[in-house]
Amino acid sequence: MATVQPIVNSHLSELDEDVFHHFGFTTKSFDFKEKFGDVKFVCVCGSSGRIHNFAISMAKLAGLALPVENIAGSHARFVLYKVDHILFADHGMGIPSALIMLHEVTKLLHYAGCKDVLFIRLGTSGGLGVKPGTIVLSDRCVNTKLEPYNELCILGKPVRRQTIVDLNTVNELKKLSENLSLECSVVVGGTIAANDFYEEQGRLDGSICTFSKEEKLAFLQSAYEHGIRNMEMEGTAITSHCYLTGHRAILVCVTAVNRLEGDQITISTDEFTLFAQRPGQLVGEYLKRNNGIIVR
């Protein structure tokens, strides 16, 4: 399991009805154990459209009829789909948005009685020393200080939560990738999760920039030498929150740019769409082989 003694919020037992505001339902909307009790995997990504497409692809692979039902309410912030033993949700952009999703999905799993669920983030990222279109399997996730923590401020006090990646699954995915005919390289390396797309990632093209090109390159080169191979904006939230709540987490992200060569994403829209599908190709095969779906 991810952690020996997962944290459970004791205040939840005092609620007559728990409102999942960002998913548009409550604990009285349906029987959570009946509806979600068999969940073994949760797949998440930033885009609602991309996670919907991935859910559709897994439903087709399972031989299920379409469309895939969005379980979330009509005015919900996030979407939620279920195909056999897999939940699919979007998390928006950045750590704050991802944490909202994580709180509500891990509460859902708690009410459903699900334990040791594997969370898989399928995303896009900026690469470090790898060409665009490369899949990076994260062997660790750090903040921009290259520390393996997600940092929060709770009741005015700083809190650091350790990030933990499920290395067994990372190694399984790497071995699996070597036996598939993927049209890209798959590398294992560290991931930086930043609080911003521009300044915290050392970009020179934001509306504010207080550092030189030389300082930027020194930072990125140092990160590369420490084994970092990509940068995104949610990983520390996912890998720390899942660990604390008794679940496992991995990050599977494709790169859209090599940050050692430039800041802006210059690949075409068609290329970006193609690259963004690559994590799903690898993860989909993994889920099929590990009983995430029931092939009919």
Swiss-Prot record:
Binding site for uridine: S125, G126, Q201, G202, R203
GO annotation, cellular component aspect: cytosol
Catalytic activity: uridine + phosphate = alpha-D-ribose 1-phosphate + uracil
SUPFAM superfamilies: Purine and uridine phosphorylases
Positions bound to phosphate: G46, R77, R121, L122, G123, T124
GO biological process: nucleotide catabolic process; UMP salvage; uridine catabolic process
InterPro entries: Nucleoside_phosphorylase_d, Nucleoside_phosphorylase_sf, Uridine_phosphorylase_euk
EC number: 2.4.2.3
One Pfam match: PNP_UDP_1
Record keywords, A-Z: Glycosyltransferase, Transferase
GO molecular function ontology, one term from the record: identical protein binding
Highest taxon in the source lineage: Eukaryota
Pathway(s) this gene product operates in, as recorded in its UniProt entry: Pyrimidine metabolism; UMP biosynthesis via salvage pathway; uracil from uridine (phosphorylase route): step 1/1
Family membership noted in the UniProt record: Belongs to the PNP/UDP phosphorylase family.
Subunit relationships: Homodimer.
Record function comment: Catalyzes the reversible phosphorylytic cleavage of uridine and deoxyuridine to uracil and ribose- or deoxyribose-1-phosphate. The produced molecules are then utilized as carbon and energy sources or in the rescue of pyrimidine bases for nucleotide synthesis.
Protein name: Uridine phosphorylase A
